Amino acid sequence: MVELKMPCASLVGRVLRPGITTVAFMLLLASPRPAQAQIDFSGVWQPVYQEDVPERLAGPALRDYVGLPINDNARQFADSWDPARITLPEEQCRVHVSPYIYRGPTMLRIWEEKDPKTQQLMAIKHYISTYEQTRTIWMDNRPHPGPNAAHTWMGFSTGHYEGDMLVVETTHLKQGWIRRNGLPMSDRATMTEYFVRNGDLMTHTFVLIDPVYLTEALVKSQDFTRSTREIPQQAWIWVCEPVVEVDRPDGEVPAYLPNEHPFKNEFGEQNYLPEAAVRGGAETMYPEFQSTIIEGRRSMTPPKPPPPPAPAAGGAAR
């Protein structure tokens, strides 16, 4: 039987809960671990879609911010979001930033680069088929560059091992998204990742800190399985060529002005959720918020039941 080592629960407690819980988990991660061989993550990995299939494939509804620690800046940005924006030639091939790219459909190839003379591990490389991105995680203790260094889609990443867990710190990210419905991530965001391998299963957990758009850390995780079959070459190629999909005047960008979004109430009404829940915020992440949802629903009009079926021609409905 394979023993699963799942860091997610401890990580959530460490970064999201203040006080005793935070201190306890920080001491736990900082405590000495027995020396052991570093885990090799090399191989071809495929994403596993479980309970978050609707989130990661079909995508979230417009103005669904439930359970996300966003602030008013993020809400204002996302409230103006028009999905038609991605039809712009400038947006069609825009690369996903590293905190977002692992969550979508992709193939992942991992390999190690070692010094040819000393065989010391210098870097871990990730080739991500989505937008054909090669990401470098430096393992040679080099420092991160200064604040004026260039920002990239993948950012600048350094890693180290804590026992059998690979910990990666990433800075110098370009502005991107944390969700497909327009919730943004700023270029001041930083990310800490935790990679854990159990046989042919790899769990990737990331903690995102963004002083511009988040009030607390955003924690997400996804699983990958190691592929043992040969992957066709075309699966690694992301063909993207911008074209004009919709004729528009030069300089026009699809967007909505404040409070003019035609679907601003749709998600809450369809899912019978009060505005306090729909608008998100750190408080909506915690179990205690359930009482707010229950109380808010009491003042809402229940959704109307569907109409009865129309009577058959020439007779009454049964």
Model-based region annotation:
Residues 1-16:
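N-terminal secretory signal peptides that target proteins for export/translocation
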Residues 2, 34-318:
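PEST-like low-complexity, intrinsically disordered acidic/proline/serine-rich tracts
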Residues 7-10, 26, 68, 87:
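Helix-centric, low-specificity signal for extended rod-like, repetitive segments
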Residues 13, 17-31:
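Bacterial N-terminal signal peptides
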